[in-house]
C-alpha cells in the first residue's frame, strides 16, 4: 500500500440514509448513572479515561435507542460502556491474552455462579442482572451465543494484529460483523421492545437481507469515520478501508468514495427487504427491523457530535467532510491499574 495522503474526504452518508434520527429524552439521567457506574471501577489510565469521556458512548445509545424507556436505555448504556472496556483492554493484548479477556466476559455473562474476582467479571455481572430482568429466553440464548462469537472474533483480531496480516474482503466481512459488536447491540433491541423473536425469524431471507444490510452499513460507516483515529494508533488493519485499499490497490480517497456507494446500496437493500417481509412472521419481526434502522442513521449523527473520531474538529468535518490525517501517537506510559485482573 502506498503512503497515505495528508487528508481525504468522507462520503456523505447522511444524504443517502433517509431514515429519521432521534434522541432519547431519558439520555441525561441514564448517561450520568451509567458513567458513574463504569467510573466507580477505575478501569482506565489517564489517556484512556479522557478518550472514554470524550467518546460519549451514552449519547450513541440515545440516538440508536431513541425509543427506549429509561430502564432499558440505562441498560444499553451500561452494555456499550462494558464493550468499551473489553475493546480497549483487548486492543493492547496478544491473541492469547485477548481470548482470555473475552472468556472472562463470556463466562461472567453465561454462568450465574461463575466469578474470577476481576473488575471485568464484576462489570459483566452487573450488566447481566439488568439484562436478564426483562429479556426473553430466546433473546437471552441468542445474546449469549453472540457474546461467544464476539469474543472469538476479538481474539482473532488480536492475532491478526500481532502478525500484521490484513484479510481479504470476503474473510473480513464476517469477522467485522462479529468483532464490531453490532450484532450484540442489535440483540438489545428485542430486550428494549419487550419482544422475543422465534428462531425461525432469523432464518427468513428478507429478514436476514435487511439485518445484514443494516449491520454492514453500521460497520462500514464506522470504519471510514474512525479510520484516521485508528491509523494514528496503528490499529487500522481491522478496518474495511485498509482491507479494500490492500485488495483493490486503490487510494484512500477512491476507497472512501466506494464505501459511500456501498453504504447507499446497504440502505436500499435494508429498505427493500423490510418492505418484502412476510406478514406471517408477525408484527414483532417488522418492529425489530424498523428499530435497527435507528442504528443506521443514529450512528452517523452521533459520529459528528463527539470528538471520538474527529477530535475538536468534529463539527468542521461534518460541514466539509475533510479529514486531515493525524501523525502516529506515541504509546502511553504505564497501563491501567487493574491490567493484571483482565
Curated annotation (Swiss-Prot):
Pfam families: Terpene_syn_C_2. (2E,6E)-farnesyl diphosphate binds at residues 308-309. It catalyses: (2E,6E)-farnesyl diphosphate = delta-cadinene + diphosphate; (2E,6E)-farnesyl diphosphate = gamma-muurolene + diphosphate; (2E,6E)-farnesyl diphosphate = beta-copaene + diphosphate; (2E)-geranyl diphosphate = beta-myrcene + diphosphate. Keywords: Lyase, Magnesium, Metal-binding. Mg(2+) 2 binds at residue 87. The record marks 84 as: Plays a critical role in the stabilization of intermediate cation. The DDXXD motif is important for the catalytic activity, presumably through binding to Mg(2+). Belongs to the terpene synthase family. This is Bifunctional terpene synthase Agr4. It comes from Cyclocybe aegerita (Black poplar mushroom).
Amino acid at each position: 500500500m502506498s503512503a497515505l495522503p495528508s487528508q481525504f474526504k468522507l462520503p456523505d452518508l447522511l444524504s443517502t440514509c433517509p431514515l429519521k434520527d432521534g434522541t432519547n429524552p431519558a439520555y441525561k439521567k441514564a448517561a450520568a448513572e451509567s458513567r458513574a457506574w463504569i467510573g466507580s471501577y477505575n478501569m482506565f489510565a489517564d489517556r484512556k479515561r479522557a478518550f472514554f469521556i470524550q467518546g460519549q458512548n451514552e449519547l450513541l445509545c440515545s440516538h440508536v435507542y431513541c425509543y427506549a424507556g429509561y430502564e432499558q436505555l440505562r441498560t444499553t448504556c451500561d452494555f456499550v460502556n462494558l464493550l468499551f472496556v473489553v475493546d480497549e483492554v483487548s486492543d493492547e493484548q496478544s491473541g492469547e491474552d485477548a481470548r482470555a479477556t473475552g472468556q472472562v466476559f463470556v463466562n461472567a455473562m453465561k454462568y450465574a455462579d461463575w466469578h474470577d474476582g476481576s473488575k471485568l467479571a464484576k462489570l459483566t455481572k452487573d450488566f447481566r442482572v439488568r439484562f436478564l430482568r426483562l429479556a426473553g429466553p430466546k433473546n437471552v440464548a441468542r445474546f449469549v451465543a453472540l457474546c461467544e462469537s464476539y469474543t472469538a472474533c476479538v481474539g482473532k483480531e488480536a492475532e491478526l494484529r500481532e502478525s500484521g496480516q490484513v484479510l481479504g474482503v470476503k474473510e473480513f466481512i464476517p469477522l467485522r460483523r462479529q468483532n464490531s459488536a453490532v450484532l450484540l447491540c442489535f440483540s438489545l433491541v428485542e430486550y428494549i421492545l419487550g419482544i422475543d423473536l422465534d428462531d425461525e425469524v432469523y432464518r427468513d431471507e428478507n429478514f436476514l437481507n435487511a439485518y445484514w444490510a443494516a449491520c454492514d452499513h453500521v460497520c462500514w460507516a464506522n470504519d471510514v469515520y474512525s479510520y484516521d483515529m485508528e491509523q494514528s494508533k496503528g490499529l487500522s488493519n481491522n478496518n474495511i478501508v485498509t482491507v479494500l485499499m490492500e485488495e483493490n490497490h486503490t487510494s484512500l480517497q477512491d476507497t472512501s468514495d466506494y464505501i459511500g456507494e456501498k453504504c447507499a446500496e446497504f440502505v436500499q437493500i435494508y429498505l427493500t427487504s423490510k418492505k418484502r417481509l412476510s406478514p406471517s412472521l408477525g408484527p414483532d419481526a417488522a418492529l425489530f427491523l424498523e428499530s435497527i434502522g435507528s442504528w443506521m442513521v443514529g450512528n452517523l449523527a452521533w459520529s459528528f457530535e463527539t470528538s471520538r473520531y474527529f477530535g475538536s474538529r468534529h463539527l468542521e468535518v461534518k460541514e466539509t467532510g475533510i479529514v486531515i490525517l493525524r501523525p502516529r501517537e506515541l504509546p502511553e506510559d504505564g497501563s491501567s491499574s487493574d491490567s493484571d485482573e483482565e
